[in-house]
């Protein structure tokens, strides 16, 4: 089985300077041959890959990839030469179901075995249509919470034998049970966007903060440093 499908086929092994809400044209977004934002291609035989999943936040939209928390984490761990493998879909309006489906795609690869999974969850009210590459909001909070609980159980089952951590940026503000927000693998639920840009994406201070948090959590849970 190959790596997950990108929704940015047109940029595979290429780049763009305008994407989603970033129409400034000042950042060069490099896409690898798998079609994901990164400065390296992916190898199914890589044993030290830290795989990152999420939304435009994990894709570091608005900033060079080298300022992303994913890149900083891989370069800030000294025990091994870790590589950051980004599987977030740029500025696509992905929902948590899409994010977990991507995690599942990686988990089901027979030859590729990530060292760590880092999962960024997004608003519980999002609904993504892969066929149309578009999304919308669902306004029923009860329905959103019920759907998310099922999705999270799936995530737990997928990664029960793996090294993994997660955090959430849920703009919907839905009250989520403590057994999720206080889960041992939860880094933080709704981290503050201590710097923002392009209307609603976090800036460099946020990425610095999250990289430190992720590194501390990896040390706490798995003695990875």
List each language-model region with its residue ranges.
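A structural motif corresponding to the C-terminal end of an alpha-helix
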Residues: 77, 150-167
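N-terminal secretory targeting modules
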Residues: 1-51, 112-115, 121-142, 148, ...
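Active-site regions of enzymes building and remodeling cell-envelope glycoconjugates
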Residues: 162-165, 175-201
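Short, well-structured alpha-helical segments in soluble
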Residues: 100-112
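Histidine-centered active-site loop/cap adjacent to the catalytic His
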Residues: 194-225
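Surface-exposed cleft-lining segments at the edges of enzyme active sites
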Residues: 57-61, 88-92, 134-149, 196-202
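Serine-esterase "nucleophile elbow" of acetyl-processing enzymes
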Residues: 26-97, 209
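Soluble or luminal CAZymes and related metallo-dependent hydrolases
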Residues: 65, 94-101, 140-154, 202-210
């Amino acid at each position: 089985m190959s790596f997950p499908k990108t929704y940015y086929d047109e940029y595979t092994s290429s780049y763009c300077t305008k994407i989603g809400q970033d129409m400034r044209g000042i950042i060069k977004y490099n896409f690898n041959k798998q079609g994901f934002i990164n400065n390296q291609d992916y190898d199914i035989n890589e044993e030290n890959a830290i795989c990152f999943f999420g939304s435009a936040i994990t894709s570091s939209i608005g900033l060079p990839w080298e300022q992303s928390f994913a890149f900083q984490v891989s370069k800030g761990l000294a025990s091994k030469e870790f590589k950051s493998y980004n599987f977030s879909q740029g500025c696509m309006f992905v929902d948590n179901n899409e994010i977990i489906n991507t995690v599942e795609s990686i988990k089901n690869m027979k030859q590729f075995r990530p060292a760590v999974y880092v999962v960024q969850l997004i608003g519980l009210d999002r609904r993504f249509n892969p066929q149309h590459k578009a999304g919308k909001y669902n306004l029923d909070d009860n329905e959103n919470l019920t759907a998310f609980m099922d999705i999270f159980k799936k995530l737990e089952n997928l990664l029960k034998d793996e090294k993994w951590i997660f955090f959430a940026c849920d703009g919907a503000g839905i009250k989520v049970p403590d057994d999720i927000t206080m889960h041992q693998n939860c880094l933080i639920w709704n981290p503050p966007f201590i710097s923002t840009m392009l209307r609603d994406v976090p800036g460099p201070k946020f990425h610095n903060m999250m990289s430190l948090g992720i590194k501390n959590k990896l040390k706490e849970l798995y003695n990875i440093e």
